[in-house]
Amino acid sequence: MVDRASASTNNQPQTSEWDALTSEKAFWRDFKYLHGTEIFGEAEPADYVYRIRSGAVRTFKLLPDGRRQIGAFHLSGDVFGIENGDIYRFTAEAIVNTSVWIAKRRRIFGDASEENTTKDVLKLIARSLNHAENHLLLLGRQTSLEKVAAFLTEMDQRMGSPGVMILPMNRRDIADYLGLTIETVSRALSLLCCEGILSFRGQHHREIVLRSRSKLAQMAILSDLKLPPS
């Protein structure tokens, strides 16, 4: 909910369809969330749509057995909180200190009867669906190594870092996103490192140097390598 954040000045993001949607239509606020702060909770009224200025957000569900299933990672420029119903289906949390723009959903979608606005709304929805489809394809990989390699390839493409890829999420986040254990994710990353495909920098190994993107992409498609035993 909005009252969990601290408001600052009103601003507007600088992407084409977002500008078109929000020009003289939405009531805008610029909010900041500290890492680990809940932005909205599952089953809360879906009153707002969010776009990330900087930082990263995870959306997840807590399963009946207590496990956490992360449905998506949202990075700078991404829009989230678009629902086809009146409540949020996931909980959203800031992974790191994050700044977002927030618009009232009814102010945006209330104008969807206009042709141009409808097109812009559909573009935003299509992006959300694309992320969801990519996640389903990723979960359908046969091996854990393929899943981790595909995840790194996706993050590399989304973050567009030519040198060092600095992941905002930790290994527990990655494991909960891929449906794996932390130990399995760690073994997969270690194997990719041993194969010379990547190397690590930084204390927490979140800074990744991709030494061979082509090999990583091949690994994401089909891998004959086996993880070392735990």
Q: What is the predicted role of each segment?
A:
Residues 1-35, 78-80, 85:
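Cyclic nucleotide-binding regulatory module and flanking cytosolic helices
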Residues 22-23, 39-43, 159:
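Short loop/turn motifs at secondary-structure junctions and domain boundaries
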Residues 28, 46-47, 165:
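Short loop/turn microsegments at loop-to-beta-strand junctions
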Residues 37-96:
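Cyclic nucleotide-binding regulatory domains
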Residues 49, 71, 100-101, 166, ...:
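A residue-level structural signature of the nucleotidyltransferase/glycosyltransferase Rossmann-like core
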Residues 72-130, 134:
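Cyclic-nucleotide recognition modules
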Residues 115-182:
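Polybasic "coupling" helices that flank or enter modular domains
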Residues 156-230:
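Phosphate-/nucleic-acid-contacting segments
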